[in-house]
Curated annotation (Swiss-Prot):
Part of the ABC transporter complex GsiABCD involved in glutathione import. Binds glutathione. It comes from Shigella sonnei (strain Ss046). PANTHER family: GLUTATHIONE-BINDING PROTEIN GSIB, PERIPLASMIC BINDING COMPONENT OF ABC TRANSPORTER. This is Glutathione-binding protein GsiB. CDD domains: PBP2_Ylib_like. One of its GO terms (cellular component) is ATP-binding cassette (ABC) transporter complex.
Length: 512
């Protein structure tokens, strides 16, 4: 009798164990392999798109952008703008809670915009909000934002990934450490952040949208090596990978369990030249370097065809972008210009990269070889996020070691101001923003400022074109390519995709 009871107990235990294993297997856990590490989980203090993309796990804004970079309501229901373009009145959704149980309301919006617009906080994204004069909570669901002057792109600023709503209680509790303790209204909350290895987020049970999220967890894992990232997808260690090494795209397409996606982007890759330093202060040198780079060949060598040669300084899908005749590859012309500029034997310089992943390494090697053919010896350095923050973003013109700098920019507002002002306006030299060419032109500054004071599309077009015409002629950059975004995912993962600004959309993601 005792033996029979023992056996049935074992059977019951076995069934229970099997059920537990089945439940564990059925958990909807997704691993996402990404190209670099995260700098912070505070969107207002992140300069990189990836950190802001991961922060969307926890955070939402009043507005957002869809796959076509069109404005959509998120925590806001609607907005109005005063006739003088100074006052924005935003109506908020009701009944939304932060992940710490506190209410999302107008007071919370005020707390976030007050923090963002206060220069004393030294937040990296301060320049997005410096035009805010004051924010008022009119009632729990109504916010009035008054600007210092008309700024026609302001609603796009509120849709930028940096403009996240953080719990005021968490801001009070954690202060400057909020970047390690995210608390928002988003679909996921922080589980673990191993700063050298991964960020894991888990489902927020109190999320305000019914039926969401559908995943139990997402683990964001930085994997710098392109081939390793692709291998993780093939072995099942990851369910989503971005960016995919272009040279492996064809191989992954043949895998019946993987879906490869190539989507449009607003990511422009370029090399800035520090125009305050010799020899790049000479326009003929800058012109020569533009002739020295074979962009169609670069598209094939570094991007395996998943890019197009740049035809301007603003990607074509951004509002008010202008296109120009692409720079032809002409090394003979490049040598002639260098000779005219006083460098018949070329010169030596440095070429830094903002990233150290495999594609960036290929771009550096290709560019180094191209420059060598016209007599320019470039010492290349591929930086990690920490090096970039310290050596490029953190130093002003006098102490900066930047000469040539390979990087990329995606104007996450979808509008030309954010594609031009941070990169070319005189007031936006590092460490303020990202004008790593240290370019300055009063006419350009004036045109950009005037464009923000008008809501007339025809006038904005005229002003932005005038600014871009000057920049294209003076060539503080070597515009290279506009990328196509190549990602891959397990076919049983749905609703997870790349935004044109290289961010992620995953609110509706599910494992089938």
């Amino acid at each position: 009798m005792a033996r029979a009871v023992h056996r049935s107990g074992l059977v019951a235990l076995g069934i229970a164990t099997a059920l537990m294993a089945s439940c564990a297997f059925a958990a909807k856990d997704v691993v996402v392999a990404v190209g670099s590490n995260f700098t912070t989980l505070d969107p207002y203090d992140a300069n990189d798109t990836l950190s802001q993309a991961v922060a969307k796990s926890f955070y939402q804004g009043l507005f957002g952008l869809d796959k076509e970079m069109k404005l959509k309501n998120v925590l806001a229901e609607s907005y109005t703008v005063s006739d003088d373009g100074i006052t924005y009145t935003v109506k908020l959704r009701e009944g939304i809670k932060f992940q710490d149980g506190t209410d999302f309301n107008a007071v919370a919006v005020k707390a976030n915009l007050d923090r963002a617009s206060d220069p004393a906080n030294h937040l990296k994204r301060y320049n997005l909000y410096k035009n805010i004069a004051k924010t008022e909570a009119i009632d729990p669901t109504t916010v009035k934002i008054t600007l210092k002057q008309p700024f026609s792109a302001f609603i796009n600023i509120l849709a930028h990934p940096a403009t996240a709503m953080i719990s005021p209680a968490a801001l009070e509790k954690y202060g400057k450490e909020i970047g390690f303790h995210p608390v928002g209204t988003g679909p996921y909350e922080l589980d673990t952040w191993n700063q050298t290895d991964f960020v894991k987020v888990k489902k927020f049970a109190g999320y305000w949208q019914p039926g969401l999220p559908k995943l139990d967890s997402i683990t964001w894992r930085p994997v710098a090596d392109n081939n390793t990232r692709a291998a993780m997808l093939q072995t099942g260690e990851a369910q989503f990978a971005f960016p995919i090494p272009y040279e492996q795209a064809t191989l992954l397409e043949k895998n019946k369990n993987i879906e490869l996606m190539a989507s449009p982007s607003i990511m422009q890759r370029y090399i800035s030249m520090n125009v305050t330093q010799k020899p790049f202060d000479n326009p003929k040198v800058r012109e020569a370097l533009n002739y020295a780079i074979n962009r169609p060949a670069l598209v094939k060598v570094a991007f395996a065809g998943y890019a197009t040669p740049a035809t301007g300084v603003v990607p074509p899908s951004i509002a008010y972008a202008q296109s120009y005749k692409p720079w032809p590859y002409d090394p003979v012309k490049a040598r002639e210009l260098l000779k005219e500029a006083g460098y018949p034997n070329g010169f030596s310089t440095t070429l830094w990269s903002s990233h150290n992943h495999s594609t960036a390494q290929k771009v550096l090697q290709f560019t180094q070889q191209q420059l060598a053919q016209v007599g320019i010896k470039a010492q290349v350095t591929a930086m990690d996020a920490g090096q970039r923050a310290a050596e490029v973003e953190g130093k002003g013109q006098k102490e900066s070691g930047v000469r040539m700098f390979y990087t990329g920019w995606s104007a996450s507002t979808g509008e030309a101001d954010w594609a031009l002002s941070p990169l070319f306006a005189s007031q936006n030299w590092p460490p303020t923003l990202f004008n790593t060419a240290f370019y300055s032109n009063k006419q350009v500054d004036d045109f950009l400022a005037q464009a923000l004071k008008t809501n007339d599309p025809a006038e904005k077009t005229r002003l932005y074109k005038a600014a871009q015409d000057i920049i294209w002629q003076e060539s503080p950059w070597i515009p290279l390519v506009v990328e196509k975004l190549v990602s891959a995912h397990s076919k049983n993962l749905t609703g997870f995709w790349i935004m044109p600004d290289t961010g992620f959309s995953f609110e509706d993601a599910d494992l089938q």
